[in-house]
């Protein structure tokens, strides 16, 4: 029986290393999970507002805490976005969900806004230039004492 001819080097498959269980199912090298949840409406009549819980889980070193939970209202997001725009001129900051003037406390409006705020934060927090270059990003996501007046 004749030996099969050797394939040219370009066609040979490189040696494939078997991955261990830990490599397949372990914590990724860098991960960032941002969730906006649990909207709560406070106040009465013209003083009503809704705030949202921001949950962050990460192992990215620029974030001081591996996990955090803070609450922010829509006006905080507006201020945060303005600060990001001033701070990060090389990055196009995405829009927030639009302001709502009628039925703003209905379940549908609150849920749509929650989804929009979550998408906004995931996009902003996941941007490599903002992760390394923004001073306000980590504070907004993780500091329960965040005060917009410190940044204006």
UniProtKB/Swiss-Prot annotation:
Q: Which Gene3D superfamilies match?
A: Phox-like domain
Q: InterPro entries per the record?
A: PX_dom, PX_dom_sf, PX_Grd19_PX, Sorting_Nexin
Q: Which terms does the record give in the GO molecular function aspect?
A: phosphatidylinositol-3-phosphate binding
State if Glycoprotein is listed as a keyword: no
A GO CC term attached to the entry: retromer complex
Q: Where does a 1,2-diacyl-sn-glycero-3-phospho-(1D-myo-inositol-3-phosphate) bind?
A: 73, 75, 99, 104, 113
Q: How does it sit in the membrane?
A: Peripheral membrane protein
Entry's localization field: Cytoplasm; Golgi apparatus membrane; Prevacuolar compartment membrane
> Start and end of every PX domain?
30-147
Keyword list, A-Z: Cytoplasm, Golgi apparatus, Lipid-binding, Membrane, Protein transport, Transport
Q: Matching SUPFAM superfamilies, A to Z?
A: PX domain (SSF64268)
Q: Name one GO biological process term.
A: late endosome to Golgi transport
Q: Please give the PANTHER family that the UniProt record associates with this protein.
A: RE52028P (PTHR45963:SF2)
Protein family: Belongs to the sorting nexin family.
Query: What does the record say about domains?
Result: The PX domain binds phosphatidylinositol 3-phosphate which is necessary for peripheral membrane localization.
Q: What does this protein do?
A: Required for retention of late Golgi membrane proteins. Component of the retrieval machinery that functions by direct interaction with the cytosolic tails of certain TGN membrane proteins during the sorting/budding process at the prevacuolar compartment. Binds phosphatidylinositol 3-phosphate (PtdIns(P3)).
Q: What is this protein called?
A: Sorting nexin-3
Q: Which organism is it from?
A: Yarrowia lipolytica (strain CLIB 122 / E 150)
The encoding gene is: SNX3
């Amino acid at each position: 029986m004749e030996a099969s001819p050797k394939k040219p080097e370009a066609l040979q498959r490189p040696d494939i290393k078997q991955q261990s269980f830990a490599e397949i199912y372990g914590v990724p090298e860098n991960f960032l999970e941002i969730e906006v949840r649990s909207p709560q409406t406070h106040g009465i009549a013209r003083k009503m507002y809704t705030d949202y819980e921001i949950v962050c889980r990460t192992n990215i070193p620029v974030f001081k805490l591996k996990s955090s939970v803070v609450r922010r209202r829509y006006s905080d997001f507006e201020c945060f976005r303005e600060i990001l725009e001033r701070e990060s001129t090389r990055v196009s900051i995405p829009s927030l969900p639009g302001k709502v003037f009628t039925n703003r406390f209905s379940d549908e409006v609150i849920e749509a806004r929650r989804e929009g705020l979550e998408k906004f934060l995931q996009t902003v927090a996941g941007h490599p230039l903002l992760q390394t270059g923004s001073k306000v990003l980590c504070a907004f996501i993780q500091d329960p004492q965040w005060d917009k007046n410190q940044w204006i």
